[in-house]
């Protein structure tokens, strides 16, 4: 009997926490499997006797993308009420109590598991980033409770004594081995097997030979997963004025395959960035691994019950350490507590060990040193120069290089065969000497036009009403206007311009007014477009102020005509304030006849009924 740990992570917190749980079980001599929820075969759930679930919460209390397949299956009305009667589960949710629906995805999952007959093992816990010690305040007692409840059911797989978390390096669970250079491996390294290509502008991908592999810089090669497609960068244009502090780009990608299936407005485009070459070289040099960086290797799991993570190449696939660091592992990640726990096990210097003990025992120390200044793993390792991460543990210690998701800013109908994105280049200063730059945005901006990259198109999270007569109100400040632009294009084509309203927000009409000329054209066709340029007057004006100004028609569209509401943009106060503004418009204070409580409930019910949606980040 092997417990199954399933996690759904948005930024990596839930994955990091799940892996800590797995290490705790293994430290106690027990076997355990740890997987993202979307890698777990759903049909096996009723037969999974011991289950441990960890999930973060996405957007307005929504499940993270990795949880959606499992969650959708659990919501099927045809499921018997006792289908999970053999399942015993523990649950830990991660969230931030400053948000309205704190740990909502975890709470929904808990309720549904119990509805289907599953039995709780102990009380669930909710990790709160706002707690004095972050999620640790809830996690550590919950972990001990879970171990106490589960361990008696599990046989010891090793007679070795319990590993002391902070001082002893546990055995590796993954292995990096030299690959044979036989002809069969040479064939495996071909383009057909690995889908490796080099970004030669306007060129075709070049095949890789074994004898060239050690010389080629893996940082310039890409692999394409089966469900991704090739696209070519056609356009990279700055939309903000040159003297404006923020650089926002319109990126256009063209599908290489003319038979690519059209995407739907509201769809999401995923990109897989690459680590910077200088960071990779610095890591290799500090870890004294430069001489091994370009040797052809394969990877495998050393535990039968633990498959390789999905962010790594499949077992047996020839690769190099340089390629792993460039395409699969994130060395610019800001380290969490678990990373410092690993360093504590590896350090050979007494002063370093004392400093690492301080980090492990005090979350504020980690926040001050790493989180607040966005210090990276590479920079952290430079500070702990007596610590080396061995090849045997690199795959376990370094976090995955996560794909980045962007709302598609175009409709297929207006831009056939192309995807347009609105990308803000992230750059800011902290107390560190070197300015911080977003990994994906800086990587994307550095690609020359003509570069071929793999992209993935995911199903929409926002859907237009099927009936074009239904009025819609779109609210998209800043880069949040991306999916709204696609919706406006579709509605104009449907002849529904007069039933479409857009509220766009920017700092100034002269600096960051995205797609201004397009909005002028759409206005002439009947689209109601209101722009809140917050800094163009003495008193700052935001989209929620314009919504309140238009209270009569907002009430008419939302209540009388049963219109839809869409909100997209930053997940700070904006979405909540927009919902409150709409609720005010339909209340007695505005232009309606509802009480304050009734109007807020009406807006919430709109989202429950899928009369619109919210996309925030």
Swiss-Prot record:
<dbReference type="Pfam" id="PF00258">
    <property type="entry name" value="Flavodoxin_1"/>
</dbReference>
<dbReference type="InterPro" id="IPR001433">
    <property type="entry name" value="OxRdtase_FAD/NAD-bd"/>
</dbReference>
<keyword id="KW-0285">Flavoprotein</keyword>
<comment type="similarity">
    <text>Belongs to the NADPH-dependent diflavin oxidoreductase NDOR1 family.</text>
</comment>
<dbReference type="InterPro" id="IPR028879">
    <property type="entry name" value="NDOR1"/>
</dbReference>
<dbReference type="InterPro" id="IPR039261">
    <property type="entry name" value="FNR_nucleotide-bd"/>
</dbReference>
<dbReference type="InterPro" id="IPR017938">
    <property type="entry name" value="Riboflavin_synthase-like_b-brl"/>
</dbReference>
<keyword id="KW-0560">Oxidoreductase</keyword>
<feature type="domain" description="Flavodoxin-like">
    <location>
        <begin position="3"/>
        <end position="147"/>
    </location>
</feature>
<dbReference type="GO" id="GO:0016226">
    <property type="term" value="P:iron-sulfur cluster assembly"/>
</dbReference>
<dbReference type="InterPro" id="IPR008254">
    <property type="entry name" value="Flavodoxin/NO_synth"/>
</dbReference>
<dbReference type="GO" id="GO:0003958">
    <property type="term" value="F:NADPH-hemoprotein reductase activity"/>
</dbReference>
<dbReference type="InterPro" id="IPR023173">
    <property type="entry name" value="NADPH_Cyt_P450_Rdtase_alpha"/>
</dbReference>
<feature type="binding site">
    <location>
        <begin position="438"/>
        <end position="441"/>
    </location>
    <ligand>
        <name>FAD</name>
    </ligand>
</feature>
<dbReference type="GO" id="GO:0005739">
    <property type="term" value="C:mitochondrion"/>
</dbReference>
<dbReference type="GO" id="GO:0050661">
    <property type="term" value="F:NADP binding"/>
</dbReference>
<comment type="similarity">
    <text>In the N-terminal section; belongs to the flavodoxin family.</text>
</comment>
<feature type="binding site">
    <location>
        <begin position="56"/>
        <end position="59"/>
    </location>
    <ligand>
        <name>FMN</name>
    </ligand>
</feature>
<feature type="binding site">
    <location>
        <position position="479"/>
    </location>
    <ligand>
        <name>NADP(+)</name>
    </ligand>
</feature>
<comment type="function">
    <text>NADPH-dependent reductase which is a central component of the cytosolic iron-sulfur (Fe-S) protein assembly (CIA) machinery. Transfers electrons from NADPH via its FAD and FMN prosthetic groups to the [2Fe-2S] cluster of DRE2, another key component of the CIA machinery. In turn, this reduced cluster provides electrons for assembly of cytosolic iron-sulfur cluster proteins. Positively controls H(2)O(2)-induced cell death.</text>
</comment>
<dbReference type="InterPro" id="IPR001709">
    <property type="entry name" value="Flavoprot_Pyr_Nucl_cyt_Rdtase"/>
</dbReference>
<dbReference type="Pfam" id="PF00667">
    <property type="entry name" value="FAD_binding_1"/>
</dbReference>
<feature type="binding site">
    <location>
        <position position="129"/>
    </location>
    <ligand>
        <name>FMN</name>
    </ligand>
</feature>
<keyword id="KW-0521">NADP</keyword>
<feature type="binding site">
    <location>
        <begin position="534"/>
        <end position="535"/>
    </location>
    <ligand>
        <name>NADP(+)</name>
    </ligand>
</feature>
<keyword id="KW-0288">FMN</keyword>
<feature type="binding site">
    <location>
        <begin position="404"/>
        <end position="407"/>
    </location>
    <ligand>
        <name>FAD</name>
    </ligand>
</feature>
<dbReference type="InterPro" id="IPR017927">
    <property type="entry name" value="FAD-bd_FR_type"/>
</dbReference>
<dbReference type="GO" id="GO:0010181">
    <property type="term" value="F:FMN binding"/>
</dbReference>
<feature type="domain" description="FAD-binding FR-type">
    <location>
        <begin position="226"/>
        <end position="465"/>
    </location>
</feature>
<feature type="binding site">
    <location>
        <begin position="540"/>
        <end position="544"/>
    </location>
    <ligand>
        <name>NADP(+)</name>
    </ligand>
</feature>
<keyword id="KW-0496">Mitochondrion</keyword>
<dbReference type="InterPro" id="IPR003097">
    <property type="entry name" value="CysJ-like_FAD-binding"/>
</dbReference>
<protein>
    <recommendedName>
        <fullName>NADPH-dependent diflavin oxidoreductase 1</fullName>
        <ecNumber>1.18.1.-</ecNumber>
    </recommendedName>
</protein>
<keyword id="KW-0963">Cytoplasm</keyword>
<comment type="subunit">
    <text>Interacts with DRE2; as part of the cytosolic iron-sulfur (Fe-S) protein assembly (CIA) machinery.</text>
</comment>
<dbReference type="Pfam" id="PF00175">
    <property type="entry name" value="NAD_binding_1"/>
</dbReference>
<keyword id="KW-0274">FAD</keyword>
<dbReference type="GO" id="GO:0050660">
    <property type="term" value="F:flavin adenine dinucleotide binding"/>
</dbReference>
<feature type="binding site">
    <location>
        <begin position="94"/>
        <end position="103"/>
    </location>
    <ligand>
        <name>FMN</name>
    </ligand>
</feature>
<dbReference type="InterPro" id="IPR029039">
    <property type="entry name" value="Flavoprotein-like_sf"/>
</dbReference>
<dbReference type="InterPro" id="IPR001094">
    <property type="entry name" value="Flavdoxin-like"/>
</dbReference>
